[in-house]
Amino acid sequence: MGKDEPGRQDLPKSATKASATPCSAIVCTVLDPLAKVLGIFNRFASRGIAAVSFHHQLKKSSLCLFLLTLILLAGTFRSALDAEATEPKRPNILFLFADDWGRYASIYADANGAGGINDVVRTPNFDRIARSGVLFRNAHVNAPSCTPCRSSLLSGQYFWRTGRGAILRGAIWDETIPAYPLLLKDSGYHIGKTYKVWSPGSPADAPYGGQKFSYQKSGGRFNQFSQNVTKLIGQGVSPDDAKEQLYGEIRGNFATFLEARPVDQPFCYWFGPTNVHRSWTKGSGKNLWGIDPDQLKGKMPAYLPDVPEVREDLADYFGEIAAWDAGIGVLLKHLEESGELDNTLIVISGDHGAPGFPHGKCNLYGFGTGVSLAISGPGVNGGRIVDDFVNLTDLAPTFLEAASVPVPEVMTGRSLWPVLKSEASGLVDPKRTWVVTGRERHVEIARADYSPYPQRAIHTANHLLIVNFRPERWPLGDPYRLDGDDVPTAEEITNSTRVTHPDEDAGPTKAWLVGVRNSPEWKSHYDWVYGKRPKYELYDRRKDPHETKNVADDPAYADVRAALEEQLLTELKRTGDPRMIDDGVYFETPPLAGPLSDEATFWEKPAKNKKK
């Protein structure tokens, strides 16, 4: 955050307390006349009228001292009251953060134009916050993998600066790294969380105080939404009543958190359901939400095969997004009923793109790193759509600034308050025209030698440049068992991520594409998704918005590639990325690579995988 950026003192008057208090008025009424008496007494004394006996002079001096003390106390008390009266009230912070939710919301169809897959998504509650606040069209995560993304968000730093928080499997949190939730707690905030904050990793949810501030005794069935609702329906419960049972758990957890809050203490609450993360019940998008897969026909981007199997899989994913949005609605309603809505900063986003789809999770394409982001609340000049490039590392300094908590110097994120307070739409801050993303290790056994797949990228409005530092490796993991006699079945690939290409989540889309890998029609598509990639990938987003045509070797783009690479590498070096030091040895050796260490908890250690 720049030193010249505005702080909480610039919040609008609507977020402040009343300018005068009854107590202050009483103090002034009682003590102001005493001050006048002292003034009159001193005038008489100066004329010799009070020049009597020494005894009388002593009494006069004592009275003067007493009155002077009262006046000084009154002035101090009044100054304190006036300062308190004009100090802005610190806002509550409600952060709603979904697992595996990219930039898919119905309002993005309105903002970007119809014709794409967002035409089919239904997110009325997210849309409500986006319309009342600011909708960001170019928000990206720093890493398209759960733990490193969350490490960067919670610390306000690039993921490569978070030690073992930079990887997924085998991650361990470094408690010396400042995390915004604990900084807010130390400043007087009542903090709490429900469901996932930081995991997999050890200790789980460490940057939020572990389970000390957990509120989820009302239940966690929402995290397997389609499975649990389908199960209840099978037991004779109506679809609406089945959903309401799960919504009730969300409501109960939030209510318990609010009830535990001391009077007049601002709160910071994190809602992190995992239902959008695979797996989902097949057909649930249509059965539970009325999302017809055929609605997606002709709308699929080039990297998603426009076939029935993939369309149904995507419709089921959108069904979980609809459930997530319904959960948002439950929290907003309860917040409004509690009387806290107007003084609550509401931020809604997700930790990366779609899981188990080409170009999605674990990829640096826009479909993998681009996420939804809407911000509304006190101090936010709403009703705008913003094109500034935002990294979710920017949220930590934004939260701290809202709470008047000093932002640690180590944070590389920049506060969004200059953008949030602006009245402009489109590009607000001319310096926010790019973001940097990257990844290292996701699943530890993705490659037989336990190595990562190191990538860094720079995203701009016109171009995407990706640098693959180890192009000899398989980007989504080794093609285990695909060339031998023990070829995995479609069911295995659908249900087990580690069977083959372990850096892509298991699911029907992955199973279908692997299944047609040798067909004349789809072999090139399979190779393009799972095959080895060149060191440089450059996409002209103006001509190729889906980022499918690599022009890195096109002489016409030589200057663009050189300029973007220099800009990217400069930022990596400026922020101390270990990948830039000694050929990245830090990320290539244990504990950042190699088998999981003994420090990993038992639930982090995978079952043995048969590799060929």
Each model region followed by its residue ranges:
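Short alpha-helix boundary/capping segments
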Residues: 11-23
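Intrinsic-disorder-associated, low-complexity terminal segments enriched in Asp/Asn/His/Tyr and depleted
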Residues: 4, 10, 32, 42, ...
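Formylglycine-dependent sulfatase
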Residues: 67, 75-537, 545-566, 570, ...
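Bacterial N-terminal signal peptides that target proteins for export
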Residues: 41, 45-48, 54-66
